[in-house]
Amino acid sequence: MTDIRLYMLQSGTLKCKVHNIKMNQGNGADYEIPVPFYLITHPDGHTIIDGGNAIEVATDPRGHWGGICDVYWPVLDKDKGCVDQVKALGFDPAEVRYVVQSHLHLDHTGAIGRFPNATHIVQRAEYEYAFTPDWFAGGGYIRKDFDRPGLKWQFLNGTQDDFYDVYGDGTLTTIFSPGHAMGHQSFLVRLPSSEPLLLTIDAAYTLDHWEEKALPGFLASTVDTVRSVQKLRTIAERTGANVVTGHDPAAWSTFKKAPEYYS
């Protein structure tokens, strides 16, 4: 039987400016942020959360992403794609049962279509918006990453399906947290021997967002962004969860990384 574990992994970094992450801050200063993704191992099949950057940006960033590279430049080694890192840990990609998407922005879609037996779980609102984004959001969605034939999708419907229990045993619960993206969701991970972990993903890029000291540099709705953080803070308080923000370089460095794990 496979132990229930959470592995924290990273698919390179993004080079950008402070104000791209913390609205109206930084005076144009350069900033480099990690691009995390997560592997949950489970006796009923494994889960990838997001998958980070698509491996194609390791060799042809501008060819794959286009003009958004002028704002966010991906740095990724050719052997650090999602699938290669899962294999390096000794896991068979065919044993991945779920690919769970927080949202469909370009630095979170590296697992879609890469695991042959996976059901892809995403918010319906996010999936639909990704095909017809508004002008200000279009650069963040790379359609060829998620518009792939033959994939199995499972759609969640906002508050109607909130706190969806992926395995049915409490290990992985989705939390609808729109604002950064139309259909963003965060995740509560409960493990046998560790305190719960609340993966905010991009509902809170950094601890500044979490502590309500700054707004994200990109958002679809300011009001929803603020209210989603408030919702997640309440959940963290009630569950005693350790909070893992989405792209905070300093905070990310404090967590165990694969091959170490939480269990």
From Swiss-Prot:
Binding-site list for Zn(2+) 2: D107, H108, D202, H247
Pfam families (alphabetical): Lactamase_B
The keyword Transmembrane appears for this protein: no
Binding site for Zn(2+) 1: H103, H105, H180, D202
Residue stretches spanning the membrane: none
EC number(s) stated in the UniProt entry for this protein: 3.1.1.81
InterPro entries tied to this protein: AHLLactAttM (IPR054889), MBL_superfamily_lactonases (IPR051013), Metallo-B-lactamas (IPR001279), RibonucZ/Hydroxyglut_hydro (IPR036866)
Cofactor note: Binds 2 Zn(2+) ions per subunit.
Swiss-Prot/TrEMBL catalytic activity: an N-acyl-L-homoserine lactone + H2O = an N-acyl-L-homoserine + H(+)
Cofactor(s) recorded in Swiss-Prot or TrEMBL: Zn(2+)
Keyword terms, alphabetized: Hydrolase, Metal-binding, Plasmid, Zinc
Enzyme class per UniProt: hydrolase
Molecular function (Gene Ontology), one example: metal ion binding
Family as reported in the entry's similarity comment: Belongs to the metallo-beta-lactamase superfamily.
PANTHER family found in the cross-reference section: 102 KBASES UNSTABLE REGION: FROM 1 TO 119443, QUORUM-QUENCHING LACTONASE YTNP-RELATED-RELATED
Name of the molecule in the record: N-acyl homoserine lactonase AttM
Organism from which the protein derives: Rhizobium johnstonii (strain DSM 114642 / LMG 32736 / 3841) (Rhizobium leguminosarum bv. viciae)
Annotated gene: attM
